[in-house]
Amino acid sequence: MLRRMRLPYVRAAAPEVLATARAQRWDPAEVLRVLLAEEAKGRDAATQRMRRKAAGFPTGKTFGSWREQDSSIEVSTQSALRTLEWVGRAENLSISGPSGTGKSHFVEALAHAVIDADMRVAWFTLESLTATIGRARVDASIAKVVARICRSDLIVIDDIGSLPAGQDAAEAFYRVVDAAYERRSVAVTSNIKPSGFDTIMPKTLATTTFSAPRIRRSCHGSRLLVHRCWPASRRGTAGILRSVVGRLRRIDASF
């Protein structure tokens, strides 16, 4: 009957729970409470596993393997980001620095924490995002695909700038940023300095696929948390995300 009612976690826990209940003379209401709690716990765990698989994480790294004292990101800033309040406010996060500074590890750990907090995550590289939007172009389902991506509470676009971005990549990036505007958080990691962020997209984008005002609104409309992971010799870089920051009210932490 429990199988028919689709209560697999009650069925799995029932023998042990009922044996304990008999030995300790539990009230029937307590037995029911414990069994239903096991079902809820099991379903929550299954949902988290499903969401982790759907997110498409690259490595599975979490804060369990993160050494906050080894990062150039201040511990207080790490703690603030780990509260995930910025995700609830649909704020955006940009972390930049050379390879090997832990950008992707930290953002992936944050993304796992987002799922642990009962939210959804979509993880892309710029290349995989471009491929996803490109496949949707074949059957004219771009709007549906972008809408599906934006059902996630956090959208991660990892390692922007590792390769030159062509027109298709730029269009895919801006479609998602525009659709997520003031609705979802977008986290970006990049191996280029913030002052060079505006060089990775084709200059023709503003006059082709999207109008310039729409791009400005997409990039400037929500608050942005900017964190730089550059070595000490490269601190003080001018022009923090010149093409993106604009009128943002931002938290700018220098590392």
How should these model regions be labeled?
Residues R3, L7-P58:
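Interdomain "pre-motor" coupling segment immediately N-terminal to P-loop NTPase/helicase cores
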Residues E16-T20, E91-S96, S195-D198:
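Short hinge/gating elements
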Residues K61-R82:
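N-terminal pre-Walker A segment at the start of P-loop NTPase domains
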Residues R82-A90:
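Phosphate-binding P-loop
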Residues A90-F106:
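Walker A/P-loop nucleotide-binding motif
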Residues A109, A113:
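Active-site signature of alpha/beta-hydrolase-fold catalytic machinery across serine-
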